[in-house]
Amino acid sequence: MNPQKGVNPTQNPPFRQVLIDESTQATEPECLIPLVMGCKQLVLVGDHCQLGPVIMCKKAAKAGLAQSLFERLVLVGVKPIRLQVQYRMHPCLSEFPSSAFYEGTLQNGVTQSERVQAGVDFPWPVPTRPMMFYVQVGGGRG
């Protein structure tokens, strides 16, 4: 938006709707930019129980910059819509966040058996465990 060209972003907003993913990791000023630019609907997606904005300056953090707009809205009583079904993690991995942060209500949208890809013949070390560490020593290209 070049003010020299006579464009007023509040009269002609570049976007009517804006969705900010991981908004709990963004600072308040970052999340306010779309509103200042005139967007009509702002959707904040995130989890205020997870990592917030990373602020390196202690003075700025103490002044409130370490709190996201999402968290501030939750603290003043705006009720967020909670994730109910997750598709990202293996069901065994989702057990911890479900019990620790979601009172055991987080459901899995994909079962363990549905996560197996057809045609992938990687020999998984322990099929009942969703994690492994693979260490490759040498043989890399330099």
Q: Predicted segments — roles?
A:
Residues 1-142:
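Conserved helicase motor core of SF1/SF2 NTP-dependent helicases
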